[in-house]
Amino acid sequence: MSKRALITGITGYVGRGVARRLLEDGFEIIGLVRNSEDDFEKRVAELRAGLGESEKLTFVRGDMTDDSALKDLNVEGVTHIVHSAAVTRFNVEADLAQAANVDGSRNILEFAKGCPQLGCFSYISTIYACGLVDGEVLETRHQGPRTFANHYENSKFDAEALLQKEYGELPWQIMRVATIIADDDHGGVTQQNAFHNTLKLFFYGLLSLVPGKAEVPLYFVTGRFVVDAIAELTQHCERQSIVHICHSQDETPTLGELLNLAYDRFSEEEDFRSRNILRPLLCDAESFGLLVGEAEEMGATLMSQGLGSIAPFAKELFTVKDIKNDRFRAALKDYRAPDPKVLLNAVCSHLIKTRWGKRAG
């Protein structure tokens, strides 16, 4: 039987990587590209350049926020769906998070109901869908009500609840992914996020205070680890299962360790040492809020933009989560965790060498 996968979010980092892996494993791929893009053909050309010319690779227009966008899509032969499309910014607005991440998920779930040959629906979520909780976070359904650091977390919680409550007949599985900080264990970075923005502010001496507690674990993974896991588990689907694509707490660095390691690595650079930059101090949420407010009053500077990407996640840096991954370990054929200090050092080295993407690596 042929394998045919529909991938939403194929223009994104994870979706594109999963498409590449499934193509290698013999899948036919249908990539859903937003029909609101004026440069649809250009985006398709870029995807083909990255994924390779293949008869097994096709693209269709479709906007997940439009409930009629998928009505004309041929469901014949669709055996797998990987729903990775989402707005993942921590500072996403509430209405956009609802439209893209919750309502958009409902639309693709409704489409999935009409796929008679569907064997697996992989929903890509986040380990932070649990919200602002301390202690153990299990690979089970999150019970509400909860509080969240931002609308992104809240929308992922709501989308998970929607999937479990209204679509029990589908062969779904939820994959909660940790923060991707590098492409692979070598530390190369092709897509930056709030983590990299924080280190950038640190390196240039624009971060005197960091919100949080030193003992808070920071769950980091590489893109290759995530893509390989999603591709493998999508092909060996355990219906109505939830897994955490992350490493365990004892394999995870803390906020304090990250700051110390980054400072030591940055201090090897002459231009960093010459500026006599001090190690950032950990502070409470109120003090950090004052810093963000002062930066905003200065206008659109590197500092205000960087802090703006950190602030919506700041509350999480005060919660000590013990993310469990026992089910994930058991399901994966070959689980391996890199040395977190070696990985972080490699990432810092890459960011320094490329000056956060401004120079060739």
Regions found by a protein language model. Give the residues of each.
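Amphipathic terminal alpha-helices
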Residues: 314, 318-361
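Conserved beta-loop-beta element that borders a ligand/cofactor-binding pocket
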Residues: 160-187
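Glycine/proline-rich active-site loop of Rossmann-fold NAD(P)-dependent oxidoreductases
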Residues: 182-195, 233-243
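N-terminal Rossmann NAD(P)H-binding glycine-rich loop of SDR-like oxidoreductase domains
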Residues: 5-27
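Conserved Rossmann-fold NAD(P)-dependent oxidoreductase catalytic core, especially the SDR/UDP-sugar
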Residues: 103-154, 173
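A conserved pocket-lining segment of Rossmann-fold NAD(P)-dependent short-chain dehydrogenase/reductase
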Residues: 93, 197-225, 229-233, 244-246
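Mid/C-terminal beta-alpha module of Rossmann-like enzyme folds, strongest
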Residues: 233-309, 358
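NAD(P)H-binding glycine-rich loop region in Rossmannoid oxidoreductase-like domains
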Residues: 61-103, 113-114
